[in-house]
Each structure stands twice: as structure tokens, then as C-alpha cells.
Amino acid sequence: MKPGIHPEYREVVFQDIGADFSFLTRSTIAAKETIKWTDGKEYPLVKIEVSSQSHPFYTGKQKILDTAGRVEKFRQKYGM
């Protein structure tokens, strides 16, 4: 590998601001803020709006649309 062209791969804390949930993982993303983690070390912090703790698919609060009913209404309305 060529030296100096690859991004730094390091441990980063991602914080879901909607669900008050944080997790530590590795990433190459640039971060301006830092946070002290539970192990006492300081890590770069990236704030995100959606994670598995707040996304409706993972939380079970997903709305299921009745697409078949909508198609039938459309066909009845326009005589198809």
C-alpha cells in the first residue's frame, strides 16, 4: 500500500441523538467532537439521527400500508 493516501481507521463513537443511544465501532469518518467513553478513554464523536434503536423497522413501530386496498379504490374510482 502507498503510504499517506489511506484514511485513518480508528475507533469512533456514534451517538443517536433521537434515542439517546451510543455505540463504539471502527470507522474512517472525520469527527470534530470527542467524548469520554465508559472505558475512560476519549474517542471521536459522530452524531447520527437514525440507528437501530430509533428506526421504525427495528423498533417494531413500523406502519404497514394496505396497498391492495388502495389499488382497488383507484380501480373502482376510475372504472378500470
From Swiss-Prot:
It comes from the Bacteria. GO terms for molecular function: structural constituent of ribosome. One of its GO terms (biological process) is translation. GO terms for cellular component: ribonucleoprotein complex; ribosome. SUPFAM superfamilies: L28p-like. Disulfide bonds: none annotated. Keywords: Ribonucleoprotein, Ribosomal protein. PROSITE patterns: RIBOSOMAL_L31 (PS01143). Part of the 50S ribosomal subunit. PANTHER family: 50S RIBOSOMAL PROTEIN L31, CHLOROPLASTIC, LARGE RIBOSOMAL SUBUNIT PROTEIN BL31C. Belongs to the bacterial ribosomal protein bL31 family. Type B subfamily. This is Large ribosomal subunit protein bL31B. It comes from Methylobacillus flagellatus (strain ATCC 51484 / DSM 6875 / VKM B-1610 / KT).
